[in-house]
Design a protein with these regions (language model features):
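Structural and coupling elements of P-loop NTPases
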Residues: 2-676
Length: 676
């Protein structure tokens, strides 16, 4: 076996953290359950993973699942991560804090591209990672063909650590290229070591030499040995494999079947020797001592819990934390986490992920410092942007107050959700990473808080502007005994270029309108522009106050404000208005084979393609720029993901307003008037 010098030595008493990542249905949860079952942490499969009603209903993970196990005297905690892009905001704070990520994939070359978003994020964060090709008992093609399909999606070379052995057309075991040993799968028990079959000796030698060539690219001494036909020592080979994976220079590849337990023990042994200690993750995050929060959740009677990884020193219940803003709080309970089960503990060792109670200010991605000074992490996640939104209306109006509090908790738990109040549309909007993500939040809202919701489409912020310039006079006169009301104004209103907004100019001379009442005229004009002929705010207009009349007794600020409003309302009727719709600039990311379908979908939504080219540093992907009406974006993400195997994404920013013509303009105006 290996010498101590070839191991990633475990810090005494510390716990190493593994993330299981990869696309939906690759078998991440099955692998976690296999790890727990093989190590005796679970009596049977299904005890820990995906226990929430929402996950069970969907048949895949929708949130982080945490569980721990012991293997050969070492402690590990596993973070089982959702695979769908709709739920991947859960990973933003978690991934930077783990020691190693196991990327779970299927043995299907056609699905290789599904790994690319995960691999790119791990590479960006600098998190060491290995691949586990799951479901190899179902594989029919060659491992080499699969590796060739996977190679373009990884920036780091993929280094096969094993080659399969076959019984007919089924994988029956593997040869470990580093150990140079052969193992045969045995259902329900550990694999059995056997001699390397004679007909595979040449294939094993070639595969091992290729592995050595790959790691020699980063070790001149090993390269010299290969060039001079010197056989490197096993310890030297393992030392290179450990170092190069930990530095992100290579990504080792293992395979097996989580469902049958094949290859799981061998994976565990490799992880035991090669997973870096917690100190590396702490250094990557620049944390000296404290608890880094992966996620928060409200857990019934337990209140708010912060799920956090311990760095620097063991964490005791009741420990005092210094928050990022300098506030001090004490842990109000410390719990070990095994799936949905929480168990109160007195202390959590370095590297462990535990649940901490009653730190209400804690948020994902923050550090609860125990060093006495505030700390903040250096590997902050990139902020998510909403891709789909609905307007919310409580089915029972008595639930409005409860709804507000419940939504705040959901958004706090899930960094991919956004809650906004659109004052103009008078709508409460819940936005997320896709329709499924938002629907999940609404299900949780009902299950946890008993609040039922009706949803509407968010209103599009249309605008109007004048069709032509016009001069308009308006007089406000009212006599009802005593002081009356009188104001007379003449204005010129004309359209301005897009994006100019509202401009007010006074050309009053000689006191036709007293100076102190000119601002009232402007206020009145603004009042009138709040609602145009089609029911939308009017913009890109210049209004010039040309003349007016006043009365020494009956004129007032309110009278001139009313006259200003009447003048612009009559001006709009005389000039007519045109309807403007908001146009967004989209940047869409798509795998290259789907790019033509994506551009067609955008065009069908009245989009204007501005450019198409390769996505930087993403081999086999395209970057598409387009203008798209905001009203056409509502369900775009669903269509986009349907065209791209669930991988497509976009960024949208307001760009300009553009005239809406014909039947569409008529329909929008009619709906606005009907809803008035």
């Amino acid at each position: 076996m290996l010498g101590e010098t070839t191991m990633a030595i475990q810090e005494k008493g510390s716990v190493r953290a593994l993330a299981l990542v990869g696309p939906t249905s690759a078998g991440k949860t099955a692998l976690m359950e296999a790890l727990l079952h093989v190590t005796g942490a679970a009596d049977r499969r299904g005890e820990v993973g995906d226990t929430s009603p929402e996950a069970k209903a969907r048949g895949h993970s929708v949130e982080l699942n945490l569980a721990g196990f012991d293997f050969m005297g070492d402690r590990y905690v596993v973070v089982d991560c959702p695979g769908s892009l709709e739920f991947c905001a859960e990973l933003d704070a978690a991934l930077p804090a783990v020691d190693l990520a196991v990327v779970v994939a299927e043995p299907d070359p056609a699905k290789a591209v599904l790994l690319q978003p995960t691999l790119r994020e791990l590479e960006r964060l600098g998190v060491p990672h290995a691949l586990f090709i799951n479901k190899m008992d179902q594989a029919r093609g060659s491992l080499q063909g699969l590796l060739e399909a996977l190679a373009p999606v990884s920036s780091a070379p993929l280094v096969a650590r094993q080659i399969p052995t076959w019984d007919g057309d089924k994988v029956s075991g593997f040869i470990d290229l580093a150990l140079e040993r052969c193992f045969v799968y045995r259902p329900g028990r550990p694999s059995e070591q056997v001699d390397i079959p004679g007909d595979l000796a040449d294939a094993e030698a070639q595969a091992r030499f290729h592995m050595l060539e790959q790691i020699a690219d980063f070790d001149d001494a090993l390269l010299e040995q290969l060039l001079t036909d010197v056989t490197p020592s096993r310890d030297a080979v393992f030392a290179d494999l450990v170092r190069e994976m930990n530095e992100g220079l290579i990504a080792p590849v293992f395979f097996g079947s989580a469902q049958n337990g094949f290859g799981v023990r061998r994976l565990l042994k490799a992880l035991r020797h090669e997973t870096p200690p917690p100190a590396r993750a702490a250094a990557r995050l620049a944390i000296s001592q404290g608890a880094y929060v992966l996620k928060t959740a409200y857990a019934g009677q337990s209140g708010k819990l912060a799920y956090a990884r311990v760095f620097g020193a063991a964490l005791a219940d009741g420990a005092e934390f210094v928050l990022a803003d300098g506030q001090r709080r004490r842990a109000g309970g410390l719990f070990s986490v095994q799936g949905a089960a929480l168990k109160k503990i007195a202390q959590a060792p370095v590297g462990d992920i535990c649940a901490i109670g009653k730190v209400e200010e804690a948020l994902a991605g923050q550090v609860l410092s125990t060093s006495g000074e505030p700390q903040s992490v250096t590997a902050a996640a990139r902020p998510r942007r909403p891709l789909f939104a609905v307007a919310l209306v409580a089915r029972n109006r008595n639930d409005d107050v409860r709804l507000s509090g419940a939504l705040s908790k959901l958004v706090e738990e899930d960094p991919g959700l956004f809650l906004t109040h659109d004052a103009e549309a008078r709508q409460v909007l819940l936005a997320g990473q896709g329709e499924g993500h938002v629907r999940l939040a609404l299900e949780r809202l009902k299950r946890r808080y008993g609040v039922e919701i009706d949803t509407r489409e968010p209103k599009t912020p249309y605008r109007e502007t004048l069709r032509q310039a016009v001069t308009q006079r308006a007089r406000h006169k009212k006599q009802s005994g005593g002081h009356g009301q009188f104001a007379d104004v003449t204005i010129e209103a004309r359209p301005l270029p897009r994006g100019s907004g509202f401009v007010f100019v006074s050309k009053i001379v000689g006191g036709a309108v007293p100076r102190q009442w000119i601002p009232a005229v402007e206020d009145g004009v603004r009042d009138g522009l709040a609602r145009g002929l089609s029911g939308y705010p009017v913009t890109d207009v210049e209004v010039t106050l040309l003349d007016g009349q006043t009365h020494s007794v009956d004129s007032s600020e309110m009278a001139f404000r009313t006259a200003g409003r009447l003048a612009i309302e009559e001006a709009m009727k005389a000039a007519g208005t045109i309807l403007l719709e908001p146009i967004e600039k989209l940047v869409v990311y798509s795998p290259s084979p789907a790019a033509s379908n994506v551009t067609s979908a955008l065009t069908a939504r009245r989009g204007q393609i501005l450019g198409l080219g390769p996505r930087e540093d993403w081999r086999g992907w395209e970057r598409i720029e387009a203008y798209l009406p905001q009203s056409e974006r509502q369900d775009l993400i669903a269509e986009l993901r349907g065209l791209t195997q669930g991988l497509g994404a976009f960024e949208a920013d307001f760009d300009h307003m553009s005239e809406l013509h014909g039947r569409l303009a008529e329909d929008v105006g009619r709906l606005a008037r009907e809803g008035a």
